Amino acid sequence: MSKQLVTQFDVKKPIMAICSIFTASLILKLIFYDPSIPVVMDALSTFSFSTHIHAIGQLPENYLHPKPLWPMFLSLFFSVFDFSQTQSYMQLQKILSILISCITIFPLYYLCKKFFNSKYSLVGILIFAVEPRLMENSLMGGTDQFFIFFIVMTLLTFFNKTKIFYLSFVFAGLATITRPEGVFLFFSIAIMLFFRLRGKKLFLSKYLISLLIFFIIILPLSIHAEQVPNTESVFSRIISSIDQFIPSDTKPTPSEISHNDIEFNKNTISILTGLEHFPKFLGWVMIPLFILVTPIGFFLFIKKLNPDKLTLIVTSVFLSIPAFYAYSYPLLETRYLYFLFPIFCIFAILPIKLFCEKMRRPNLVLLGIMLMIIFISVLFISYQFDFQHEKESVKVAEIVIENTSSINEYYPESKYIKSLDISQNWLELNH
């Protein structure tokens, strides 16, 4: 029986295996999902913008969310469901984030297939499906999972050598509307497409059409952003971000950054600070699943380079730039590096593949590795993330709101105050 099971692991029906991984990922996330915890910070800002769109039936004319596509997407679902409590819509936002993180497994499998066969591609999506930090992040309801989905779709369609590659610029445009960091995804595929098409028939027309598709996607919201007071388009934000690194003799003026309600000064940005924190956080986010395999896989990719492998490396470098910028403040959060995780999964497959192929029973070894991945992930989540503390923090925040009129900051637990202090009556909130 055991021998038959291992032989069947040679994956003749990969769709069943993918669906099994999808189901396992969904079940694990729902186990840790707590409906009593509201959305907070950036996810709360997204929720507020979504409710505003839902209430007026269009984008507000007086302000624009810096990451508008996710709240626009949420507002469609807010229109479909009819809940009486605001908290129910917050939970809908979190559940949609969980579903998108699980759905990303499907295109990621076919992206892995560009480099490996079916059974090793399953290892890549399993790592992604149970990666502890991605699991925790998907429970928050923020933009990150939506953005990661578009990264995977961009790369998957870009590697297609038919006209489907044009879709990669559609997805890169959607990624940019989801988060401004998406423009770096666009830069990476635009550079690689130039080298892919160079010297071929209709090179210039194909290249310009690709760029045009991207700009058509982002232009409407970019124009709207420039017309809305105190709002920047993605290109204005890039220019202002670059300006942060240029020394100025004038007296510095504080500029507010939407992050945990903290004000940063322009002159606090330092390349040296970024160089200090970036490698430290890069190493930290690789624990526990990537730390032993992804660095090895990265160097093995470089050793036997081809255009597709080079595209992955170039994309990972470009997507690291926004993280380096964040750590230059420093904004000390690991989530700025989560956008690299789909590529990390692909890098991780190669050393696992080479290790298994050296064993006498590679399928059995591979099955053992996959079970170990799940075990390590669950163990890490159980010990690293204190979900009970978060639940208790919500209860404390409820007591504070009920019994006080003014509140002293006690971050990070106080992050729930703002979420719980809004009207819990959905009709009141929308009027």
Regions found by a protein language model. Give the residues of each.
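Membrane-lumen/periplasm interface segments of specific transmembrane helices
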Residues: L28, S205-P295
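Signature aromatic-anchored transmembrane alpha helix within multi-pass, membrane-resident enzymes
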Residues: C19, K119, V170, F187, ...
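Hydrophobic/aromatic-rich transmembrane helices and adjacent perimembrane loops
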Residues: D144, A175-P180, F184, I287, ...
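Membrane-embedded, lumen/periplasm-facing catalytic core of multi-pass transferases
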Residues: M372-H431
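Short acidic/glycine- and proline-prone juxtamembrane loop motifs at membrane-interface regions
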Residues: V40-M41, P66-K67, R133-F146, E333
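Transmembrane-helix motifs of polytopic, lipid-linked glycan transferases
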Residues: C19, T23, L92-F115, M153, ...
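Hydrophobic, aromatic-rich transmembrane alpha-helices
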Residues: S2, F106-L108, G274-D308, T315-L319
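Membrane-interface alpha helices of multi-pass inner-membrane proteins
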Residues: G124-I125, T157, F165-P180, F186-A190, ...
